[in-house]
Amino acid sequence: MDYLIAYDLGTGGNKASLYDADGACLAEVFIAYPTTYPRAGWHEQRPEDWWQAVVQSTHLLLQQAAVRPAEIVAIGISGHSLGVVPLDRHGGLLRDSTPIWSDARAAEQARAFFSRAPETDWYLATGCGFPPPLYSAFKIMWYRDHEPEMYARIAHVIGTKDYINYRLTGTITTDFSYASGSGVYDLLAWRYNPDLLEASGLPAAIFPEIVPSTQVIGALTPDAAAILGLAAHTRVVSGGVDNSCMALGARNIREGRVYNAQGSSSWIAVTSAKPLLDARIRPFVFTHVMPGLFNSAFGAFSTGISFRWVRDNLCRDLVEQAAREGGDVYDLMTELAEKSPPGARGLIFHPNMGGGSSLAPSIHLRGAFLNLDLGHDRSDLLRAVMEGVAMEQRLVLDALRALDPGIGRELLMVGGGSRSRLWRQIYADTYNTTILKTSVDQQAAALGAAACAAVGAGLWRDFERIDQIHIIQDRSDPDPGRSRIYEQILAVYRQAAIDLSNLGDRILALACPGRET
């Protein structure tokens, strides 16, 4: 038998999954790693933590599965985007902890860049619809301006999954989907843009060679094979950025298909032969891992991670209870949230704890509970968070529908948030759209990475098998009464985004003790 391993390097940790040649997931293991926040707007992770999570999860996966290492023929990786891992000419890591996709430290570098290159032209060429400081090129410019000695030693700057690919094979490359988040990649030309590189002042040589997501970039080095417990002949394909791997795993293998991803961050994406670009509301676009296609999306940065923040700060007793009982703390949290009625008794939560998206009036928009009073209890707080996360994504869905009116009234939901029956119903009622859950929920990005490996290794001729793997397990239809409640709340939520953005801009200027700006 032939088997595949997929690594899904998410914001919260790495999930290793074992697939058979038909695309069935036989086993999976998750290893968490931390994000640190050294200053306001700085979000960092340690590349060594990613590697150790890959090593540990591989060992546990092999222990779970009754397969021989020699039967694993290929590996594919999905990785969170906009990474900037600096390597010297020997491949050595130059920074122990590196900015991740949500890190916004490079605002000054973005402003300097746009004094040389018009921002609208840059967006229309790149499709980079996140706030500009998040994109890789500006973070590299920050390295240059703030850590010149380290910057002078840089030979390559690569992303999350490409760093793991390098540790696996010794080869430094990227794929089209990950390169499309560099900030200097031209979507329609399918290459780095020389004019944007010139405006950045960055040497083209530090950006990795771009290859297809299904291309075999090498076999495991003897050292990597020994550390992982795998055979040295195991091939590694380039893989892709999480957005695009998830699109593939979520059945977006044809034009017009849409999915909603629920994780630490969330997004709604449509697949098309041409990128959906709008200079005013700026959807973000990544090249698909499938040749000739694009994924255009709007996202919400702090959705699932807001729920995790509530878990860590307001539900420590539930964490302990789940540990004692061998249960899932999120199940306990949603059971408690269900005791609060729709609308959380007038309590509204804004989940933008990591900053505003391109749809927000300001990147300095931050999270808030609104209308909190002494009559509210923890069940209201929890339900308000779940509803606020759904409200934020309703804004996303409305913006996408304005660009593509053909988006239908059924939506496939994938990712960790799709597991909760209550949350799926809240989404259905808030979106006024039917939510579908299939047999592939949290496995979508991993399935996409595995599919890249399957095609690259010659086990699959193409990606058509993806449709056969999905089996519909649940359908949540909107309730008209609850939808009317949420429509009323949505009007307040929209206004609150404006007001909170203004407050965020003002608070940024405050010299608060213990708060870095």
Q: Each PLM stretch: what is its role?
A:
Residues 1-96, 153, 222-226, 230-235, ...:
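N-terminal glycine/serine-rich phosphate-binding loop of ATP-dependent small-molecule kinases
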Residues 63-101, 126-136, 165-186, 209-212, ...:
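Short beta-strand-loop/turn "lid" adjacent to the catalytic site in phosphate-handling enzymes
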Residues 23, 46, 75, 103, ...:
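Residue-level signal for inorganic ion chemistry
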Residues 32, 100-101, 301:
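A generic structural motif
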Residues 31-33, 212, 478:
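Active-site donor-binding loop signature of nucleotide-sugar glycosyltransferases
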Residues 5-6, 107, 114-130, 134-173, ...:
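Active-site core segments that coordinate phosphate-bearing ligands/cofactors
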Residues 46-53, 111, 117-120:
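Short, solvent-exposed cationic patches
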